[in-house]
Amino acid sequence: MTVLTIYREDLPEQPLTQATDGAAEIAALLAQQGLRFERWPAQVELADDATPEQILAAYATEVDRVKTEGGYITVDAVSLRPDHPDRAALRQKFLAEHIHSEDEVRFFVAGQGLFSLHLGDHVYALLCTQNDWISVPAGTRHWFDMGSQPYFTALRFFNNPEGWVAQFTGSDIASQFPLLP
């Protein structure tokens, strides 16, 4: 279930607002902050071990639309499972607050991940689940938690042919907010 929890940056133990699984409500709250959120319908039933090519083919219509709208030049599919040998190191890398010089655009084909967005003096923690699509504007301070036992498959859209390139802020704010188990 998709959940958006909003906190003041100085009160990580006290949520101000929580929206649960109402795509329209979540999209409206995020749009007020300049972010886009959509829920895409499942196109086909994909096997847990589906290849990146099969995943991209299953969502070809949506992928083409987003590439055209956003001018994205590359799209890939990434999967992480609990048995991935580098899961702990990858989790730590993404948990550090960072920004990008391009939009960070993700679609969750399966599983879940927690995007925490540091917007002004608030933190918007969005638990993305299957069929959720999010676009985080360039320059937005954020971090991502995949959990200690990650399970997700996501499409990633890029303007930069180098792919995921982060500029870390040096802030420890991510360590103050709830994480996935």
Curated annotation (Swiss-Prot):
Which enzyme class, named as a word? oxidoreductase
Task: Show which residues form the site (May play a role in metal incorporation in vivo).
Answer: E97
Indicate yes or no for the key word Metal-binding.
Answer: yes
Annotated residues that bind Ni(2+) are located at H98, H100, E104, H142
Pathways per UniProt:
Amino-acid biosynthesis; L-methionine biosynthesis via salvage pathway; L-methionine from S-methyl-5-thio-alpha-D-ribose 1-phosphate: step 5/6
Recorded family membership: Belongs to the acireductone dioxygenase (ARD) family.
Question: Per its record, how is this protein called by name?
Answer: Acireductone dioxygenase
Q: Which organism is it from?
A: Synechococcus sp. (strain ATCC 27144 / PCC 6301 / SAUG 1402/1) (Anacystis nidulans)
Q: What is the lineage of its organism?
A: Bacteria, Bacillati, Cyanobacteriota, Cyanophyceae, Synechococcales
Q: Which gene encodes it?
A: mtnD
